[in-house]
Amino acid sequence: KECMADGTVCYIHNHNDCCGSCLCPNGPLARPWEVLVGNCKCGPKA
């Protein structure tokens, strides 16, 4: 299965699909609502 490239918006249901980590402005999966509204993007492995 392919992973999602860095910069791809990641959500709570697919944050494990990032090639690296699902990063939010306040840290990885910092606040559930940030993930839900699309503020988080795939980035380098934390």
UniProtKB/Swiss-Prot annotation:
One Gene Ontology term, aspect cellular component: extracellular region
Keyword presence, Endoplasmic reticulum: no
Location within or outside the cell: Secreted
Keyword Nucleotide-binding: no
InterPro entries for the chain: Insecticidal_knottin-like_sf (IPR053718), Toxin_28 (IPR012633)
Free-text function comment from the UniProt entry: Insecticidal toxin. It inhibits insect voltage-gated sodium channels (Nav) by partially blocking the channel pore in DUM neurons from the American cockroach, not by acting as a gating modifier. The inhibition is only partially reversible after prolonged washout. In vivo, the toxin causes flaccid paralysis followed by death when injected into Heliothis virescens larvae. It also causes uncoordinated movements followed by full paralysis to sheep blowflies (Lucilia cuprina).
Free-text comment about domains: The presence of a 'disulfide through disulfide knot' structurally defines this protein as a knottin.
Annotated protein name in UniProt: Mu-segestritoxin-Sf1g
